[in-house]
């Protein structure tokens, strides 16, 4: 594992998406972090050792999804599909579909498998799946503050994990989307989907893929409203853990009472024209029960 030294840093951003504000001073203790996201091979070892069944492989409870069509209550997960041309990017159903049978073993559905993807990040894992793996490995998932501090790699004020220039010297530093989203990906960075973990340079703490490739689970409940900044570094909150669970429910879907966690880092689907979230400050809300083809995780070990 890689050592993350801890310290006081400026979390969030006032220059991008509203849910990233306010930029504020926060302190985290030192800890250890997996240098790479958990791979398919590593997750398979966990399943083989424990017999664990992921959330995407279990039947759904109709009471949790009022009004859902019966075909959407069979085990499965959300799968990205490239569109045939330009679409309304305000409607994610244009490129996300619930696919019965999709799970970590079959990321795109029953016709897919993990052949040649052993060293790719495991996806289609819900929050419960990630925490189960972490417990088996003797580890935990990071808080949002821990994750963001680690992602910055010592570059507290930089926009990206590696600095302020997105393509330094024309070099791709992360697995993101190049081209008009979601209908054409030029794959100029070498990958149209997930990439093997560690395909791009590490940050200052020796951590790979802290931007792009796959979003990563954290333990914090999501709220679009963050605490205000403090007047002095001496007053910075120490090891914050986010709001209460009740704050995380989606106000746009009041009938669905599935809480949401913060995911960080962006993914191979993030594009400058649509989702410019391949930055340390970026964050997104994710329902805890939902696996998707662009969400994975990595673990931490905190000092005793």
Range-by-range predicted roles:
Residues 34:
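An anion-binding catalytic pocket shared by soluble metabolic enzymes
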Residues 39:
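Acidic-aromatic/histidine active-site loop/patch
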Residues 251-255, 284-291:
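Short proline/glycine-enriched turn/loop segments at secondary-structure junctions
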Residues 293-304:
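Short, structured beta-strand segments at or near domain termini in extracellular proteins/domains
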């Amino acid at each position: 594992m890689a050592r993350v030294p801890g310290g006081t840093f400026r979390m969030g951003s006032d220059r991008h998406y509203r849910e990233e504000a306010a930029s504020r001073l926060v302190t985290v203790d030192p800890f250890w972090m997996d240098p790479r996201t958990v791979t398919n091979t590593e997750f398979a070892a966990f399943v083989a050792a424990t017999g664990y069944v992921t959330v995407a492989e279990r039947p759904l409870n109709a009471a949790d999804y009022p009004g859902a069509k019966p075909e959407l209550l069979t085990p499965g997960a959300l799968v990205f599909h490239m569109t045939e041309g330009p679409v309304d990017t305000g409607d994610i159903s244009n490129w996300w579909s619930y696919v019965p049978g999709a799970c970590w073993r079959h990321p795109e559905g029953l016709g897919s498998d993990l052949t040649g993807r052993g060293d790719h990040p495991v996806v289609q894992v819900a929050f419960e799946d990630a925490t189960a793996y972490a417990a088996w490995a003797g580890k935990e998932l990071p808080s949002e503050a821990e994750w963001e501090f680690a992602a910055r790699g010592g570059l507290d004020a930089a926009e990206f994990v590696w600095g302020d220039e997105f393509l330094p010297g024309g070099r791709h530093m992360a697995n993101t989307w190049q081209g008009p989203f979601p209908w054409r990906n030029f794959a100029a960075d070498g990958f149209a989907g997930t990439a093997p973990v560690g395909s791009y340079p590490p940050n200052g703490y020796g951590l790979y893929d802290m931007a792009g490739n796959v979003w990563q689970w954290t333990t914090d409940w999501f709220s679009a409203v963050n605490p205000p900044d403090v007047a002095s570094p001496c007053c910075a909150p120490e090891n914050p853990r986010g709001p209460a669970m009740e704050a995380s429910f989606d106000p746009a879907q009041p009938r669905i009472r599935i809480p949401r966690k913060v995911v960080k880092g962006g993914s191979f689907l993030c594009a400058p024209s649509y989702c410019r979230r391949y930055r340390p400050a970026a964050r997104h809300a994710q329902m805890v029960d939902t696996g998707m083809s662009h969400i994975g995780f990595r673990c931490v070990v905190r000092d005793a």
